[in-house]
Amino acid sequence: MTETTRKPEWLKVRLPHGEGYERVKAIVKRTKLATVCEEARCPNIAECWGGGTATVMLMGEVCTRACRFCHVKVGAPPPLDPMEPIHLAQAVKEMDLEYIVVTSVNRDDRPDGGASHFASAIRELRRESPRTIVEVLIPDFKGVEKDLTTVAEAKPHVVAHNVETVERLTPTVRDRRAKYHQSLRVLEYLKNRPEGLYTKTSVMVGLGETDAELEQTFKDLRDVGVDVLTLGQYLQPSQYHLRVERFVTPAQFEAYKTLAESYGFLYVASGPLVRSSYRAAEFFMKGLMERERLERLG
């Protein structure tokens, strides 16, 4: 193991525990809910589950795209379960979550990429758990505006789509069908829609990007109106995935946060263990929406 791949101390985390965590874990196991928290072995699982948030995955566990940073299985996915949105909403209601993030594999085998399935899940969640904030982390749907509209019209509170990396590294890091500028167009289209959605994206560092490229990415994201940005350390999930080119220090993450904030994001979460679905960012969104609700009342 080389210096570039040996994990530093700041990436070591304690084993998850706590009453809230154990309660959510039991419900997840009983309902057979597919959570990204477990699938991706997220280091923040105890903080999130214990604090009333979770990230769940729709449309199966087999993806039609092969991104070189991602540990999800690739292949021909099974048919969609039409009851999945209902079962998801029932499980989330039982967990009494304050914030739910719904994401999915890519389903390029579906005519609409799974957009209508996402929309069904959003509507069921909002019906069963009206006080739960619903964030969706969506694929690019090949940039098809009709499919993006299907998701937007279901009115999630937050819609996220990840650019993942800087423009130069996109062909190396992401599946060849994923395009940097297409992702920007997706985010711009969603932001400009009449639903008034908050938009969010995530960038991994440690893949070989330069500071200048990161700054250009921050600028590109603000140019299309992205509200919330999360920055985190890329970690190699297996020997078959892209290697870590560098481990970014906590101090450098703070510098990136300051730089990104200068471009006008509503919120930037930046740190070694920050992930796309990150408790601090969700806490910010919850507070923002509560302030908006009070303003409407008052």
From Swiss-Prot:
Ranges for domain Radical SAM core come to 49-266
Enzyme Commission designation: 2.8.1.8
For the keyword Nucleotide-binding, the answer is no
Cofactor: how and how many bound: Binds 2 [4Fe-4S] clusters per subunit. One cluster is coordinated with 3 cysteines and an exchangeable S-adenosyl-L-methionine.
Transmembrane residue ranges: none
Asked whether the keyword Metal-binding is assigned, the reply is yes
Look up the record and name the pathway of this protein: Protein modification; protein lipoylation via endogenous pathway; protein N(6)-(lipoyl)lysine from octanoyl-[acyl-carrier-protein]: step 2/2
Q: Which PROSITE patterns match?
A: RADICAL_SAM
GO cellular component: a single term? cytoplasm
Entry keyword set: 4Fe-4S, Cytoplasm, Iron, Iron-sulfur, Metal-binding, S-adenosyl-L-methionine, Transferase
**Positions that bind [4Fe-4S] cluster 2:** 63, 67, 70
Which cofactors must be present for this protein to function?
A: [4Fe-4S] cluster
Binding residues for [4Fe-4S] cluster 1: 37, 42, 48, 277
On the tree of life, the source organism's domain of life is Bacteria
Q: Which reaction does it catalyse?
A: [[Fe-S] cluster scaffold protein carrying a second [4Fe-4S](2+) cluster] + N(6)-octanoyl-L-lysyl-[protein] + 2 oxidized [2Fe-2S]-[ferredoxin] + 2 S-adenosyl-L-methionine + 4 H(+) = [[Fe-S] cluster scaffold protein] + N(6)-[(R)-dihydrolipoyl]-L-lysyl-[protein] + 4 Fe(3+) + 2 hydrogen sulfide + 2 5'-deoxyadenosine + 2 L-methionine + 2 reduced [2Fe-2S]-[ferredoxin]
Localisation per UniProt entry: Cytoplasm
Recorded hits in Pfam families, A to Z, give: LIAS_N, Radical_SAM
Q: Name one GO molecular function term.
A: lipoate synthase activity
Q: Which HAMAP family match?
A: Lipoyl_synth
Q: Which PANTHER family match?
A: LIPOYL SYNTHASE, LIPOYL SYNTHASE, MITOCHONDRIAL
Which family is this sequence assigned to? Belongs to the radical SAM superfamily. Lipoyl synthase family.
**Protein known as:** Lipoyl synthase
Q: Which gene encodes it?
A: lipA
